[in-house]
């Protein structure tokens, strides 16, 4: 509908001798007295046209032409807003599109022929996934689903580092716990991994090898076994949340020598040096960001010879460009806020278009019970573990709670609320709307022999009450909500929208008798219910949650 209104406005502008701008904004007024849709086009063009905004709005409105069955009237409000009032018949007839398109409703070909990569989770295999990583995982998965709904060919990638000091400490931790299983007295350093999962890995080693590895001083075997065990645990946790990846990129590749005799990391250093952005002092190699107006340069290679996080991150992003991704989406935790701008600047210097990169930063998560901050894990040395949260509230509640607040906002995860079986719980409220419709349709089949073939679009003209029209109009918003969520990388917009649809449906269900209504009205209201169920299903699919048929 919004596209239709925009096209009409463009024609009206041309008829008025005004070149239409590239973007025309159509919004839904919060107050229904100002119509079903509104545009500020006269306000945005007034200065350019050297006219009073309200006068310009009247001129544009006079040139607007619509098919008679679509727009009932237009009005001018305030300083120059043009408001559109749709005909009730058009709203309800348009609902047919929802069921005609079914699972495809809301999908577009916007990204057809374009490749997108979404990197998310990317936790190194040093321990179980934490709740904080879980929020980023759900956010990334939903963003990937949104992009796929718009026709993009999406690669879901997990970037990890199985080298470096932390992996060495992991291997040492497992070896010491293994020796403990062998009956040796050990001194376990405070600097090593304290989690019970280390003892679990060591116990499995002992169960398989007995004391055979006691004399093994090399850490490679312990490291490999620990990495395999932890990665299996990570993948299992993600699977529980319906999260998967298409590829796993090992940072180790960035240290391997290529055909030109240099590694990707070395090539980045050479290219930045050639551009004049490398300095060597204090025994380290620096990215000269002071030339970019920053207070300090940023270290790329430490005096120990070990690279900082920035160097492989830059090299890794170069591979994304080389793999011809037109959309590069990074889902990071708040701890990356200070680092990623340097990566963007380096890529710009290297000649890559930074506009192809979009970064979604998700803020921290705290879990609360009865208003008190709690730690989900009871196991020694473990932070708040994602598995423990899933065990407590379930996968659907975990996913939806992670994204029901803006990614830019700190999330207070109310564990008790997530477990409630009442409308206070937004997850229950959403899923109950779907289950309620399923139960209604089943009852209609049993009591009145209802089948979907009974429904004709002409019956929808019988629906004109405010509750019916508001629900019908909301269903038609679904494609635009998806587009907005994609532009903003904000699945929360989907959650808000679906909650609004559920709210409207529950109200419609209470105020508009369905099975007891006259036959034609009954069928029309069942039609509207089925369309609502379809929108909820399509939205749930993008958000990665189930659509229960009974609750």
Swiss-Prot record:
<feature type="short sequence motif" description="'HIGH' region">
    <location>
        <begin position="123"/>
        <end position="133"/>
    </location>
</feature>
<dbReference type="Pfam" id="PF00750">
    <property type="entry name" value="tRNA-synt_1d"/>
</dbReference>
<dbReference type="InterPro" id="IPR008909">
    <property type="entry name" value="DALR_anticod-bd"/>
</dbReference>
<keyword id="KW-0963">Cytoplasm</keyword>
<dbReference type="Pfam" id="PF03485">
    <property type="entry name" value="Arg_tRNA_synt_N"/>
</dbReference>
<dbReference type="InterPro" id="IPR009080">
    <property type="entry name" value="tRNAsynth_Ia_anticodon-bd"/>
</dbReference>
<comment type="subunit">
    <text>Monomer.</text>
</comment>
<dbReference type="Pfam" id="PF05746">
    <property type="entry name" value="DALR_1"/>
</dbReference>
<dbReference type="GO" id="GO:0006420">
    <property type="term" value="P:arginyl-tRNA aminoacylation"/>
</dbReference>
<keyword id="KW-0067">ATP-binding</keyword>
<dbReference type="InterPro" id="IPR035684">
    <property type="entry name" value="ArgRS_core"/>
</dbReference>
<keyword id="KW-0030">Aminoacyl-tRNA synthetase</keyword>
<comment type="similarity">
    <text>Belongs to the class-I aminoacyl-tRNA synthetase family.</text>
</comment>
<dbReference type="InterPro" id="IPR001278">
    <property type="entry name" value="Arg-tRNA-ligase"/>
</dbReference>
<dbReference type="InterPro" id="IPR005148">
    <property type="entry name" value="Arg-tRNA-synth_N"/>
</dbReference>
<protein>
    <recommendedName>
        <fullName>Arginine--tRNA ligase</fullName>
        <ecNumber>6.1.1.19</ecNumber>
    </recommendedName>
</protein>
<dbReference type="GO" id="GO:0005524">
    <property type="term" value="F:ATP binding"/>
</dbReference>
<keyword id="KW-0436">Ligase</keyword>
<dbReference type="GO" id="GO:0004814">
    <property type="term" value="F:arginine-tRNA ligase activity"/>
</dbReference>
<dbReference type="GO" id="GO:0005737">
    <property type="term" value="C:cytoplasm"/>
</dbReference>
<keyword id="KW-0547">Nucleotide-binding</keyword>
<dbReference type="InterPro" id="IPR014729">
    <property type="entry name" value="Rossmann-like_a/b/a_fold"/>
</dbReference>
<dbReference type="InterPro" id="IPR036695">
    <property type="entry name" value="Arg-tRNA-synth_N_sf"/>
</dbReference>
<keyword id="KW-0648">Protein biosynthesis</keyword>
């Amino acid at each position: 509908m919004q596209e239709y209104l925009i096209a009409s406005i463009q024609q009206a502008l041309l008829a008025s001798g005004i070149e239409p701008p590239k973007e025309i904004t159509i919004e839904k007024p919060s107050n229904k007295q100002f119509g079903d849709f509104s545009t500020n086009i006269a306000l945005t063009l007034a200065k350019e046209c050297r006219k009073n905004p309200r006068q310009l709005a009247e001129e544009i409105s006079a040139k607007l032409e619509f098919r008679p069955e679509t727009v009932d009237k237009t009005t001018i409000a305030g300083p120059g807003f043009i408001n559109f009032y749709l005909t009730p018949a058009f709203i309800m007839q348009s609902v047919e599109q929802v069921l005609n398109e079914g699972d495809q409703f809301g999908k577009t070909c916007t990204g057809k022929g374009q490749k997108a990569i979404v990197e998310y989770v990317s936790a190194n295999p040093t321990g179980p996934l934490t709740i904080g990583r879980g929020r980023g995982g759900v956010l990334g998965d939903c963003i990937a689903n949104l992009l796929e709904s718009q026709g993009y060919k999406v690669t879901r990638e997990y970037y990890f580092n199985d080298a470096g000091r932390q992996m060495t400490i992991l291997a040492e931790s497992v070896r010491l716990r293994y020796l403990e299983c062998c009956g040796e007295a050990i001194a376990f350093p405070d600097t090593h991994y304290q989690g019970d999962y280390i003892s679990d890995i060591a116990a499995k080693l002992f169960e398989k090898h007995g004391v055979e590895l006691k004399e093994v001083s090399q850490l490679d075997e312990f490291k490999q076994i620990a990495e395999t065990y932890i990665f299996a645990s990570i993948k299992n946790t993600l699977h529980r949340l319906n999260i998967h990846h298409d590829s796993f990129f090992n940072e180790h590749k960035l240290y391997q020598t290529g055909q030109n005799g240099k590694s990707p990391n070395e090539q980045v250093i050479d290219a930045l040096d050639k551009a004049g952005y490398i300095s060597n002092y204090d025994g380290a190699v620096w990215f000269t960001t002071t030339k970019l107006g920053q207070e300090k340069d940023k270290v790329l290679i430490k005096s120990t010879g070990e690279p900082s996080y920035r160097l492989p991150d830059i090299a890794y992003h170069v591979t994304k460009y080389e793999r011809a991704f037109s959309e590069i989406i990074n889902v990071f935790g708040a701890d990356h806020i200070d680092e990623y701008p340097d990566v963007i600047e380096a890529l710009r210097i290297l000649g890559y278009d930074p506009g192809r990169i979009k970064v979604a930063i998700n803020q921290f998560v705290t879990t609360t019970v009865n208003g008190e901050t709690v730690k989900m894990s009871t196991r020694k040395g473990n932070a708040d573990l994602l598995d423990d949260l899933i065990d407590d509230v379930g996968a659907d509640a975990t996913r939806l709670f992670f994204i029901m607040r803006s990614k830019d906002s700190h999330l207070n995860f109310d564990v008790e609320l997530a477990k409630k079986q009442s409308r206070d719980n937004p997850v229950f409220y959403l899923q109950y709307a779907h289950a309620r419709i399923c139960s209604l349709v089943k009852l209609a089949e049993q009591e009145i022999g209802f089948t979907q073939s009974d429904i004709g679009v002409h019956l929808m003209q019988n629906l004109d009450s405010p509750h019916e029209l508001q629900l019908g109009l909301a269903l038609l918003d679904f494609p635009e909500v998806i587009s907005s969520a994609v532009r903003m990388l904000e699945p929360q917009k989907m959650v808000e929208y679906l909650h609004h649809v559920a709210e409207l449906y529950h109200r419609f269900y209470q105020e508009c008798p369905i099975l007891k209504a006259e036959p034609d009205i009954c069928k029309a209201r069942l039609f509207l219910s089925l369309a609502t169920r379809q929108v909820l299903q399509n939205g749930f699919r993008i958000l990665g949650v189930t659509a229960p048929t009974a609750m």
